[in-house]
């Protein structure tokens, strides 16, 4: 079976958003991202294909907003970061023009030739560290990492003030979780503490708390909010906030270091609808888009968009923030070390 054929059985939902052809961009004056010349060229192309790892509960209504404003039909293909990375690589080698924009947290790991160099006008409004110097990707939301806790199981006064303090809580053994892919967090820990001290710190935490290694950050956040786990040793703050906004008893607190990477958008070098791709990339960096995503707990990369609830970014940035953007080789190295420390292999 060829590499391309293997994807025939993948459960990658291709979800076509409703087309609102009668929707005129009369509101362009209030939408700086909606360039009239680019819009006309994009509408002539007919549609937009999005590859995204964002869950459908957020992604579908977000791109329905794009469709309602522009009249451009969107095919939304949702899968995990790993599946999308593999799929895009195979399609690129096969010279397929299959998607227009990618929206995942791993675009910075893609070879430069797979992405078009493009600087959306709205990029000037996002933080400097969320802009790729090669103009291949831009941060749509900030993926801050911090521990989380079930507010009915653990009192705020009991929370550790440093990662060293975790080993003092033997009563939490077996009630602490961490996702099995948190290699970015591990790299930040060792960078902050130094390799020897950092490894000793993690080994102490594992020995005392015996963390449950989970599969899926959102599932872990939901399990923490439900009380299955009392503590998430680390998780994406936006997902913990998503569960909190749904009415569950979960909170976050910040420790040194706070790991940061980004949910990113990039334009395919082989986009079948290049003008629609550029318009959509600009939309993803707009105030309108980031305000929409903030309703789900996503943390904005724009200074003019407030987090939900307010003050989360300010709390996190009072600590030492370490931005982690790794190549595929670096990620494999840190994942091996993570597996050795947390899984004993």
Model-derived segments and spans:
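Bacterial N-terminal signal peptides
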Residues: 9-22
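Extracytoplasmic "Venus flytrap"
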Residues: 30-35, 43-61, 263
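Periplasmic-binding protein-like
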Residues: 128, 143, 171-181, 202-206, 211-214, 284-307, ...
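A ligand-binding cleft/hinge motif common to bilobed small-molecule-binding domains
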Residues: 106-112, 230-249
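Extracellular/periplasmic bilobal clamshell ligand-binding domains
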Residues: 308-345
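A bilobed periplasmic-binding-protein/Venus flytrap-type ligand-binding module shared by bacterial periplasmic
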Residues: 146-153, 190-192, 262-273, 292-295
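Extracytoplasmic ligand-binding site segments that recognize negatively charged/polar headgroups
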Residues: 49-64, 75-228
């Amino acid at each position: 079976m060829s590499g391309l054929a293997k994807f025939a059985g993948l459960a990658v939902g291709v979800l076509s958003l409703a087309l609102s052809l009668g929707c005129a961009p009369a509101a362009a004056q209030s939408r700086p991202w909606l360039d009239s010349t680019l819009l006309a060229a994009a509408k002539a192309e007919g549609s937009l294909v999005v590859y995204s790892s964002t869950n459908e509960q957020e992604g579908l209504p977000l791109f329905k907003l794009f469709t309602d404003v522009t009249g451009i039909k969107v095919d939304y293909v949702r899968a995990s970061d790993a599946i999308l990375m593999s799929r895009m690589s195979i399609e690129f080698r096969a010279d397929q023009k299959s998607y227009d924009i990618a929206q995942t947290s791993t675009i910075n790991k893609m070879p430069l030739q797979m992405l078009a160099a493009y600087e959306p006008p709205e990029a000037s409004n996002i933080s400097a560290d969320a802009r790729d110097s090669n103009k291949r990707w831009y941060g749509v939301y900030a993926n801050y990492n911090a521990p989380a806790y079930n507010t009915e199981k653990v009192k705020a006064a009991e929370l550790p003030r440093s990662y060293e303090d975790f080993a003092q809580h033997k009563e939490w053994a077996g009630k602490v979780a961490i996702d099995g892919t948190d290699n970015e967090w591990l790299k930040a820990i060792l960078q902050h503490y130094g390799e020897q001290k950092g490894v000793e710190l993690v080994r102490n935490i594992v020995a005392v708390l015996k963390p449950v290694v989970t599969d899926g950050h959102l599932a872990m956040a939901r399990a923490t909010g439900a009380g299955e786990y009392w503590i998430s040793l680390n998780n994406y703050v936006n997902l913990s906030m998503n569960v909190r906004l749904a009415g569950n008893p979960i909170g976050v607190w910040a420790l040194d270091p706070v790991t940061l990477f980004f949910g990113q958008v990039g334009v395919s070098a082989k986009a079948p609808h290049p003008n629609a791709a550029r318009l959509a990339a600009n939309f993803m960096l707009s105030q309108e888009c980031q305000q929409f995503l903030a309703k789900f707990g996503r943390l904005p990369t724009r200074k003019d968009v407030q987090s939900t609830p307010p003050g989360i970014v300010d709390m996190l940035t009072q600590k030492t923030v370490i931005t982690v953007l790794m190549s595929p080789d670096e990620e494999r190295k840190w994942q091996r070390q993570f597996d050795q420390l947390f899984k004993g292999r």
